[in-house]
Amino acid sequence: VGGAPVAGKIAEILGVEAGSSEKQVAFVKCAGTCDVAANKYHYVGEMDCRRAAMVPGRGEKACSYGCLGLGSCVEVCQFGALSIQNGVAKVDRDKCVACGQCVATCPNHVIDLIPYSSAYAVQCSSKDKGKAVMEVCQSGCIGCGLCVRQCEFGAVTLEDNIAVIDGTKCQGCGKCAEKCPKKVIHAQQ
């Protein structure tokens, strides 16, 4: 809350060196809205992601990596920074204080804290390969590597069949997002 000046004073009092403190923000690694993600069944249990994740198949969405959309993250956010829109959690970047409660609560680990200054991020967490992704979600990363080949700065790599953007290398040119056939790479500003 107090930023770098307060961190510096606290470090001075404690006799340690202050690290850098870049503002963070929650980011939902799923674009699998009701319009684009297939369902395996209709879930009628308790409206809680943690409970739904205990059901065989980890919720009603056919993608076992995606946002369950039942709002457990919304419930724990004391700042009103999260909402469920069309079956997927959405973050209000201006309200998020990066407390990490949503990250800790999400049973599918779909929410991460990323630097507020990140230019682009990949809105998918599936580790499945292309064809398997397309069978369950029209907006999932298919691991085609076009984004990797477009990046002149080496900021985009493929890890576990999914594009990963290194914010320390990303120059914000947007070529990766332009080339992505699934439009799963999004500008954050």
Task: Please give the residue ranges for each predicted region.
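Ferredoxin-type iron-sulfur electron-transfer modules and their immediate structural context
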Residues: V1-Q150, G154, A177-K179, K183-Q189
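Hydrophobic residues embedded in beta-strands of well-ordered beta-sheets
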Residues: A89, I162-A163
